[in-house]
């Protein structure tokens, strides 16, 4: 049935000379690794009420008086460490992914890239798809695990700027077999040259209060141990989705529970974030005698500051100070051929929802 639906949609698109638009969304990046550019980016990012979910006046004080006077200078130095000759890694790899997904999907589709913050904007991407005379729209935020601060914020922006009458959304793919298989293949490729003592799956963290707002039920979860398998009671819980992704990848790799762990990075501010924290987890692993560590970042399909600098440089340095021998960061999926095919398959599968 799915194949027939896809075939009918393609025939209709060709007949009417209308393409199917695919909008890939990523978080965003500064235009350059300078203090002014980073300040502009952070101002837009942190002013989003879904990112800092406090009353508007309190958010303004936090952003403009506590963060922007200090953080842009520090962050600009971090961006300078990972900046590529072609530009921001996140933008370079995202554009590469967009191009290759477009080539894979073929002439009946038009693929555009929009950033929630910074350039190219979601509005600009939607205009490109409209100019290409697309009549149907598939929206795919590149956030495997659903959260209000990433996926919901991006989709809110799409709905505010969208003029397409027919739209379908892939709002999460944390357990999508094509995504899990792509991650597993990527890890296997790196195991050819490095055999770790332990695997650490490090995800972007969130303030704990975000889980409560998403419907995570406190009564069944103390957020200290591994989350329970996905069910109706925690299907919208970001933390539970991260643990489920890890379980599925570990199962494909034939890992025991003692061979891998899950932690959360990139916390900001003084509020309580979901645990365990990646930097604290490294300390515990060193105490257990782990020497060779492989770190995988499944919540980042495209390499960015959080993978290349936070893990690839800072965590690497911390691990060496703790007495570890090697910390190997697995690259993000970026434009890996299997991942490109996975996105194409997810897009085609979503056509049956129109």
UniProtKB/Swiss-Prot annotation:
Q: Which residues bind Fe cation?
A: 204, 306
Mind telling me which GO cellular component terms the entry cites? cytoplasm
Give the pathway listed in the UniProt entry for this protein.
Porphyrin-containing compound metabolism; protoheme biosynthesis; protoheme from protoporphyrin-IX: step 1/1
Known catalysed reaction(s)?
A: heme b + 2 H(+) = protoporphyrin IX + Fe(2+)
Tagged with keyword Chloroplast: no
Top enzyme category: lyase
Keywords, sorted A to Z: Cytoplasm, Heme biosynthesis, Iron, Lyase, Metal-binding, Porphyrin biosynthesis
One GO MF term attached to the UniProt entry: ferrochelatase activity
Provide the transmembrane region boundaries.
none
An example GO BP is:
heme biosynthetic process
Record carries keyword Lyase? yes
Q: What is its EC number?
A: 4.98.1.1
Q: Which PANTHER family match?
A: FERROCHELATASE, FERROCHELATASE, MITOCHONDRIAL
Question: What HAMAP family does the record point to?
Answer: Ferrochelatase
Role played: Catalyzes the ferrous insertion into protoporphyrin IX.
Family listed: Belongs to the ferrochelatase family.
**Protein's UniProt name:** Ferrochelatase
Give the encoding gene's name: hemH
